[in-house]
Amino acid sequence: MKPKVFITRQIPENGIKMIEKFYEIELWKDPKAPPRGVLLEKVREVDALVTLVTDKVDKELLENAPKLKIIAQYAVGYDNIDIEEATKRGIYVTNTPGVLTDATADLAFALLLAVARRIVEADAFVRSGEWKKSEVGWHPLMFLGYGLKGKTLGIVGFGRIGQALAKRAKGFGMKIIYYSRTRKPEAEEEIGAEYVDFETLLKESDFISLHVPLTKETYHMIGEKELKLMKPNAILINTSRGAVVDTNALIKALKEGWIAGAGLDVFEEEPYYNEELFKLKNVVLAPHIGSATHEAREGMAELVAKNLIAFAKGEIPPNLVNKDVLTSSPP
């Protein structure tokens, strides 16, 4: 008899086809996340769970899952999962690193360009008919933005995605500085990046892009103090986690001109609505689509499947997050 898995959202079919060879699948087909009560009910009878970042896997849920042995997260980040509690209960937790690196780096750079060159603002100007009404065909001062060549890009968090972004920026002639918990000498040499402390990065960067996980240490690491250290022409990009930035402080900074603009793909609460933020023209917003390419999402589905299949075969999943679990619950 196959073990049971509950998948909390429709993932690409390539992953489903791989998983169904080893598991009995129950799939939540509604695009909205399953209600809390439904999720608590479903986990009671399953051996495996496939989750998204919007699924809260806390102590309460784990207490309701006596048979649960593995949680396969369909994402790189896993701040929605109580890793410590899962490990205590001998539950494996896996993620999907690597396959979404290029997609997320592409989006970060797209946001950077969109804000710097005021692309969304210009698009709205044309579509709304305002350009026609203005009777100004072309003007030397129309929609002036910022060029990239020779500018400094500060990258906070220099893992796979941060390094991929740096390589793209190099092609635009940008100078790269970075701050990370640990220095990356090999990457510094390969890419031509310079390690600096956090305060120096904030003060010297023309563009700042965030690529850190959400932890107690990174929560609101960009707040009023940090925003005031940045250049008045600086642009902030966030494709990591929304709570890394204090939203209220950012709104104040954008309104009062402490910084020039921002590009956000993530928010403190998702789905997100803030009328005050939405009125600002110097911010470009996206609905958490960092990995939203066919290639990345299919690659993530394949990794989820590989992690589940390895576990079903009595092997260590290739992307095991909580390796301490092997001490109490070896495969």
From Swiss-Prot:
Q: What is its EC number?
A: 1.1.1.26
Binding, NADP(+) = F158, G159, R160, I161, S180, R181, T182, T239, S240, R241, H288, I289, G290
User: Which Cys-Cys disulfides exist here?
Assistant: none
**What is stated about pH in the biophysicochemical properties?**
Optimum pH is 6.5.
Q: Name one GO molecular function term.
A: glyoxylate reductase (NADPH) activity
Q: Which compartments is it annotated to reside in? A: Cytoplasm
Catalytic activity reported:
glycolate + NAD(+) = glyoxylate + NADH + H(+)
Source species, domain of life: Archaea
Annotated InterPro entries: D-isomer_2-hydroxyacid_DH, D-isomer_2_OHA_DH_cat_dom, D-isomer_DH_CS, D-isomer_DH_CS1, D-isomer_DH_NAD-bd, Glyoxylate_reductase_GyaR, NAD(P)-bd_dom_sf
- One Pfam annotation reads 2-Hacid_dh
- What CDD domains does the entry give? GDH
Alphabetically list the UniProt keywords: Cytoplasm, NAD, Oxidoreductase
Q: How does activity depend on temperature?
A: Optimum temperature is 90 degrees Celsius. Extremely thermostable.
Q: What class of enzyme is it?
A: oxidoreductase
Q: Does the keyword Oxidoreductase apply?
A: yes
List the GO cellular component terms: cytosol
Catalytic machinery residues:
R241, E270, H288 (proton donor)
Instruction: Spell out the family assignment given in the record's similarity comment.
Output: Belongs to the D-isomer specific 2-hydroxyacid dehydrogenase family. GyaR subfamily.
Q: How does it assemble?
A: Homodimer.
Against PANTHER family, the record matches this protein to: 2-HYDROXYACID DEHYDROGENASE-RELATED, GLYOXYLATE_HYDROXYPYRUVATE REDUCTASE B
Q: What is this protein called?
A: Glyoxylate reductase
